[in-house]
Swiss-Prot record:
Positions of C3H1-type zinc fingers: 108-136, 237-265, 285-313, 433-461, 477-505
Gene3D superfamilies in the cross-refs: Zinc finger, CCCH-type (4.10.1000.10)
Superkingdom of source: Eukaryota
Biased composition (Basic and acidic residues): 1-10
Biased composition (Polar residues): 333-344
UniProt entry keywords in alphabetical sequence: DNA-binding, Metal-binding, Repeat, Zinc, Zinc-finger
Any Pfam family the entry gives: zf-CCCH_2
Region called Disordered, residue ranges: 1-36, 134-179, 313-347
Taxonomic source organism: Oryza sativa subsp. japonica
Keyword Cytoplasm appears in the UniProt entry: no
Bias (Low complexity): 14-31
Stated name of the protein: Zinc finger CCCH domain-containing protein 65
Keyword Repeat: yes
Length: 529
């Protein structure tokens, strides 16, 4: 046994079996030799074979997962049973060691595919990566006569499966630097055929579409479908996209000029349907706070975009039941329909305000026909109270212009104290504070919504005395500048409560004569005092 241990164990063929490695002499011993020596020799050969197998197992590289790659065997033997010289075997060993030094990537069929490896053909984690690295399908390339692999310069069926080294070089050779393969022979992500054993469910549940071939950009089709659905929703629901600022507390600053759609709540009402407009074209919002600027000045720079309430003058009438009209009837109810008709006459509402809140206001007759009513006759209840003078004559400018007939200043219709129901505003309703500034809203409109709570002064006579009104019912104040609105349009929205001058031409009334033509009506620009 000591001699057997001293001898070097012979190398065994990897494809040979232990029975095949026994020499014929030991398998068929001579009849004259001792049987004990034969058994000892057989045991020595079997023991040497086991030691050789253990040594080869230590020298062989660990499996890398590439089943289709060649296995390099260290030693003087190669698969096939042929023996090579020591120099050739050493060269094969060096070549195998160089192949082992290149990065390898594991195959893990039960794990998801490595995203980075699928896109770029490389993975920085190498063998430590816990994901699957499937085989990449290469482009079919026709090799020339001098570029053939193997003996005879042709590709044999045994070399159909490429080595891992060639597959690692494939991304650089075929797809460029870090650009996914978009050739027609592979799918959009560079996967192999759909029948491969790798687990592709996690990366193929979304379908992709190539949107830029040069840059290698891909986009999920789900995003494209979502964009198309959004366009269809916009086209089906309305002809324009919905404004995103309209539903915010600040609203849309463009108002009706906005090119997007303004929807109100789930019902989808547009802004043209949601509010009514008063006679000035301002929105009526009964449930909202009254616009402070509108209540002070009678106008609002925000127009229809204002979020506050702009009540009509008829809606702010006094609640005192003792106030009556000049004919002794009960006060008329406020006309609500006038708010939605901007072209309707605005002075019935203003007349109601003046009758209830402004003292010393007498109704003036209508001069549409150019004649005065008989003395003592009052106009009917449906009288407008204020007639707008036409600005443009119906006849050419060559027609001689006559002055409008004026009523005597002492006409009984202009004597407000004689009209019942028009008494002076009681001091209990509006406080008088001589040391404080005058309430501008009370001076202009004759009404103050704060009443006794107002901290400003409310003079007892906010309008001019009797006899200072023109036939149009507007105050004549020579010491004040001409009302800009009256001089421009011929009307004044404040009526008798206006603090500016509203001049008018007066001349003696002719004894008898035909009615005046429409072209003979005076204009606000043609007046002299």
């Amino acid at each position: 046994m000591a001699d057997a241990d001293a001898r070097a164990p012979p190398k065994s063929d990897p494809g040979a079996t232990p029975i095949g490695s026994i020499s014929p002499s030991s398998a068929a011993p001579a009849a004259g030799e001792d049987e004990v020596e034969v058994e000892v020799e057989v045991e020595e050969q079997l023991a040497g074979l086991a030691i050789a197998d253990q040594g080869e197992e230590l020298l062989l590289p660990k499996p890398t997962g590439w089943e289709d790659g060649p296995v390099v065997v260290a030693g003087d033997e190669v698969s096939g049973g042929e023996k090579l010289p020591g120099e050739v075997a050493a060269a094969v060993g060096v070549e195998g060691a160089a192949a082992d030094s290149r990065p390898r990537f594991p195959r893990r069929p039960g794990e998801p595919d490595c995203t980075y490896y699928v896109k770029f053909g490389s993975c920085r984690f190498g063998m430590k990566c816990k994901f699957n690295h499937p085989a990449r399908k290469k482009k079919s390339r026709v090799k020339g006569s001098n570029g053939g692999s193997g003996s005879g310069g042709s590709n044999s069926s045994s070399n159909k499966a490429s080595s891992p080294d060639d597959e690692q070089q494939a991304p650089k050779e075929e797809y460029g630097s870090y650009v996914p393969d978009i050739s027609p022979e592979v799918d959009s992500l560079g996967f192999a055929d759909k029948g491969s054993a790798s687990n592709l469910e996690n990366f193929k549940k979304y379908s992709y579409e190539i949107i830029d071939v040069k840059k290698g950009r891909v986009e999920p089709k789900e995003l494209k479908v979502a964009k198309e659905k959004r366009k269809e929703f916009i086209s089906e629901g309305s002809s324009q996209e919905e404004c995103k600022y309209y539903s915010t507390p600040g609203g849309c600053k463009f108002g009706k000029a906005c090119k997007y759609l303004h929807r109100d709540g789930k019902e989808g009402k547009t802004d043209a349907e949601k509010v009514d407009l008063n006679f000035l074209g301002l929105p009526l919002r009964p449930g909202e706070k009254e616009c402070p600027y509108y209540m002070r000045t009678g106008s609002c720079k925000y127009a229809t975009n204002c979020k506050f309430h702009h009540p009509d003058p008829s809606n702010v009438a006094s609640k005192d039941p003792q106030l009556e009209h000049e004919n002794g009837d009960a006060p008329q109810q406020d006309v609500q329909g006038s708010s939605s008709q901007p072209n309707a006459s605005i002075w019935p509402d203003q007349r109601t305000v003046n009758e209830h809140h402004v003292p010393f206001i007498a109704p003036s007759p209508s001069y549409s026909a150019g004649m005065l009513p008989p003395q003592g006759m009052y106009p009917p209840p449906e009288w407008n109270g204020y007639h707008q003078v036409p600005l443009n004559p119906y006849y050419p400018p060559g027609v001689p212009f006559q002055h409008f007939p004026a009523a005597p200043i002492n006409h009984p219709m202009y004597k407000a104290p004689e009209i019942p129901g028009h008494q002076q505003v009681p001091s209990e309703e509006y406080p008088e504070r001589p040391g404080q500034p005058e309430c501008q809203h009370f001076v202009k409109s004759g009404f103050c919504k704060f009443r006794m709570k107002c901290k400003y002064h409310h003079p007892r006579s906010p309008v001019p005395p009797a006899g200072a009104l023109s036939p149009l019912g507007l105050p004549i104040k020579p010491d004040q500048p001409v009302c800009t609105y009256y001089g421009r349009y011929g009307v004044c929205k404040f009526g008798p409560a206006c603090a500016y001058n509203h001049p008018f031409n007066f001349s003696p009334v002719p004894a008898a004569g035909p009615p005046l033509l429409p072209a003979q009506y005076p204009t606000p620009g043609n007046y002299t005092l």
